[in-house]
Amino acid sequence: MSIKADRWIKRMAQEHGMIEPFVDGQVRGGVVSYGLSSYGYDIRIADEFKIFTNVNSAIIDPKNFDPRSFVDVKADVCIIPPNSFVLCRTIEYFRIPRNVLCVCVGKSTYARCGLIANVTPFEPGWEGYVTIEISNTTPLPAKIYANEGIAQVLFFEGDELPDVAYDDRSGKYQGQTGVTLPRI
């Protein structure tokens, strides 16, 4: 399994729609950077946020998730409460090839502020907008910015095709279009 370079990422995005919209090169200057990098792609977050709140004193249960645990916000910035988290989604829509696995890691700009981006791997054959969880590990409110970078996606090409890909097993998050809550 090898990591893929910018040339491959660009070709797959432009010829096969792997990333839409695709930004060829790094956008910087007054923003948290995003776009194509040497061995990855820095993704942006949309202006749709689900901010965790415990106003209903709910118990978090992934098998029976209560959507009232979140407050929906549509804005250019999102304030994450201290020691809490927010769910958001990417601006980019991904179509992952059958022989590729993607791993997503947070950007150091946010990590240095105590904000941690968590995303599970993008499995072979998966497509959709990526739901991202951003944790505020600090005792202070923290700000994140829509339409700017949040994490970097790394693309790994497998040595052979899997017997069963995500789309073959009708994965529960296949084709997700918005911020998606836990499903069983």
UniProtKB/Swiss-Prot annotation:
Q: How does it assemble?
A: Homotrimer.
Single Gene Ontology BP annotation: dUTP biosynthetic process
Q: Which family does it belong to?
A: Belongs to the dCTP deaminase family.
Q: What does UniProt list as catalytic?
A: E133
Q: In which pathway does it act?
A: Pyrimidine metabolism; dUMP biosynthesis; dUMP from dCTP (dUTP route): step 1/2
Physiological role: Catalyzes the deamination of dCTP to dUTP.
Per the record, the domain of life is Bacteria
* High-level lineage: Bacteria, Bacillati, Chloroflexota, Chloroflexia, Herpetosiphonales
- Name this polypeptide is given: dCTP deaminase
